[in-house]
Amino acid sequence: MAALLRLAVLLPLAAPLVATLPTSPVPIAARATPHEPVFFSWDAGAVTSFPIHSSCNATQRRQIEAGLNEAVELARHAKAHILRWGNESEIYRKYFGNRPTMEAVGAYDVIVNGDKANVLFRCDNPDGNCALEGWGGHWRGANATSETVICDRSYTTRRWLVSMCSQGYTVAGSETNTFWASDLMHRLYHVPAVGQGWVDHFADGYDEVIALAKSNGTESTHDSEALQYFALEAYAFDIAAPGVGCAGESHGPDQGHDTGSASAPASTSTSSSSSGSGSGATTTPTDSPSATIDVPSNCHTHEGGQLHCT
């Protein structure tokens, strides 16, 4: 009986405690201020297409854009071939010897995925060099290091990758600038934002590129010519004529070069020049605005006024 009385006394005290307990959870929003979402884009402002100057008309722009797209396609496949086969690839060893693959992969990837803000293609011939015989374009050098001029000759002489391994084309026997893709790859490597002052001319022409690879020097995987030749042969063998390609044979060291006299650039800084040490060759910009220059017997000139001596 006494126990029941004590329970009766305690029940009124416990009832308010039970009544104050919540019957359902309080929404989180009512208990705490939610964090504001953070919007962050690490690549904000990235430029993913090569800029083309307003001096290019509609047809010029379309051709340059298509050529640049093919340059990216050529570089992308070269990179993919290396990533798949490494230096087990016979084509890789042919052009790069036993060099590690990372440098060549990077040289192609910067064309494919690098930011393109500091590259500009134009058509208005600001330095006057398109008037020089045989010029299809040129890097503007110190006049404007990010700019490349495409001259009218390019529109009538460059071919598309779909025609590779036809019309007598071979990798060894034809010029690297046969195609828009490889011509623009070469021009891009002169621009600091792409070549970064590292891709350079250490060998000239097919035979020197092959000799450089056989020497296993350190230059082949950042030699402009080697990078072009490898990309062309890998594309020819894998894509254009699968399993067959069109490697061809060299026509000799002087193929495609003027060994007599050459027109000089209209300004001292428009040649795509640099020095190399890998093959004992030197590359010297022509530095006079005169109409012609004498070329030593051990030298020849590239399109764009570049003097290359061995």
From Swiss-Prot:
Highest taxon, organism lineage: Eukaryota
Renumbered to this chain, the Low complexity biased-composition regions fall at 258-292
**Where are the annotated glycans?**
N57, N87, N143, N216
Annotated signal sequence is 1-16
Keywords in alphabetical order, please: Allergen, Glycoprotein, Secreted, Signal
| GO MF | integrin binding; metallopeptidase activity; zinc ion binding
Protein's name in the database: Major allergen Asp f 2
The organism encoding this protein is Aspergillus fumigatus (strain ATCC MYA-4609 / CBS 101355 / FGSC A1100 / Af293)
